[in-house]
Amino acid sequence: MTNIRKTHPLMKIVNSTFIDLPAPSNISSWWNFGSLLGICLILQILTGLFLAMHYTSDTMTAFSSVTHICRDVNYGWLIRYMHANGASMFFICLFLHVGRGLYYGSYMFMETWNIGVLLLFAVMATAFMGYVLPWGQMSFWGATVITNLLSAIPYIGTDLVEWIWGGFSVDKATLTRFFAFHFILPFIVAALAGVHLLFLHETGSNNPSGLSSDSDKIPFHPYYTIKDILGALILILALSSLVLFSPDLLGDPDNYIPANPLNTPPHIKPEWYFLFAYAILRSIPNKLGGVLALVFSILVLMLMPLLHTSKQRSMMFRPISQCLFWLLVADLLTLTWIGGQPVEYPFVIIGQLASILYFTLILILMPIASLVENNLLKW
């Protein structure tokens, strides 16, 4: 008799995704981040659901309701900080997942990659709107500054901003709709993640060598289930340590001051995971130019399959490309640091140089390095 997991319509899908899936035998821990992102998303949806039970999306009571969650709700402080720091863990996993894709040439699976970039945009939008909800100083001014960027769009810009605000400034209407969008978007992210997985399983996973692994596959369970469980335990340990020992480490102290439209904080800055993009935005003196650079800093990922000039898929055997890749990582860390600094000398010029280097590396230097390596290896 055939096993039920191979015949039952629903179990069959689970089986072909998580149990009998043929996986390459040599994928490293860099391939763990897909499952870790899934865990992060589930965790965020669950903690978010419980927070939504006690939160009120009204300008008069939003800040107080978050205080109430932390002080009066059973383990409310834990749920709130799990959610806030869970977002940080989510982005750490996202950046490492994207970095893995760049290093090992996973972007050659174009449908999977493009949906991944859409997922990145969706998660960034969700995180931005979530940051507005506590209605602290940085929530209010962050929302004002970032939504205001849309006014740089010619002709329709101002109307668009006022339409998003639901008035002439960030106010009750803005907070209410941001809460609605923040609630619905994670479910859209979950659906997109399902499509992401669907396209991945059409081709099978890539592997560190970038070569076809069809001749050497192993079942996902038990080999990679146990490996994913180890990754999950490390993730939970890291998140628990952050939440229980220094929950405010990655937050902004200004967000413990209730939103005040009459008082601007000295340094308006987003959460740490947006700082690299914020630095690129600020490095261009022109408003529209800055907005375009900001969008293109993420959108450039969509061009990766077109910029791939190497005859090898992975960077595993390409030392020049490896050096440029790690230079790109260092550059992104520099941009993250600059994004959190005030707009003054020498930070402005460092930010401008780092922004130029970012686009130069991706659009010019890495494709040229690949061509040089093709010649050196006589391919």
Curated annotation (Swiss-Prot):
* GO CC annotation, single: respiratory chain complex III
Residues reported to bind heme b b566: H97, H196
**Main localization category:** mitochondrion
- Domain of life, per lineage: Eukaryota
- Residues bound to a ubiquinone are H201
Please name the GO terms of the biological process aspect recorded for this protein, alphabetically.
mitochondrial electron transport, ubiquinol to cytochrome c
Question: Entry's InterPro entries?
Answer: Cyt_b/b6_C, Cyt_b/b6_C_sf, Cyt_b/b6_N, Cytb/b6-like_sf, Cytochrome_b, Cytochrome_b_C_euk/bac, Cytochrome_b_N_euk/bac, Di-haem_cyt_TM
Q: Provide an example Pfam family for this protein.
A: Cytochrome_B
Question: Membrane topology type, per the record?
Answer: Multi-pass membrane protein
List all membrane-crossing ranges. Answer: 33-53, 77-98, 113-133, 178-198, 226-246, 288-308, 320-340, 347-367
Q: Give the cofactor note text.
A: Binds 2 heme b groups non-covalently.
Tell me the compartments it is located in.
Mitochondrion inner membrane
Which GO molecular-function terms appear in the entry?
metal ion binding; ubiquinol-cytochrome-c reductase activity
| Family per record | Belongs to the cytochrome b family.
Quaternary assembly = The cytochrome bc1 complex contains 11 subunits: 3 respiratory subunits (MT-CYB, CYC1 and UQCRFS1), 2 core proteins (UQCRC1 and UQCRC2) and 6 low-molecular weight proteins (UQCRH/QCR6, UQCRB/QCR7, UQCRQ/QCR8, UQCR10/QCR9, UQCR11/QCR10 and a cleavage product of UQCRFS1). This cytochrome bc1 complex then forms a dimer.
Summary of the function given for this chain in its UniProt record: Component of the ubiquinol-cytochrome c reductase complex (complex III or cytochrome b-c1 complex) that is part of the mitochondrial respiratory chain. The b-c1 complex mediates electron transfer from ubiquinol to cytochrome c. Contributes to the generation of a proton gradient across the mitochondrial membrane that is then used for ATP synthesis.
Miscellaneous comment:
Heme 1 (or BL or b562) is low-potential and absorbs at about 562 nm, and heme 2 (or BH or b566) is high-potential and absorbs at about 566 nm.
Protein's name in the database: Cytochrome b
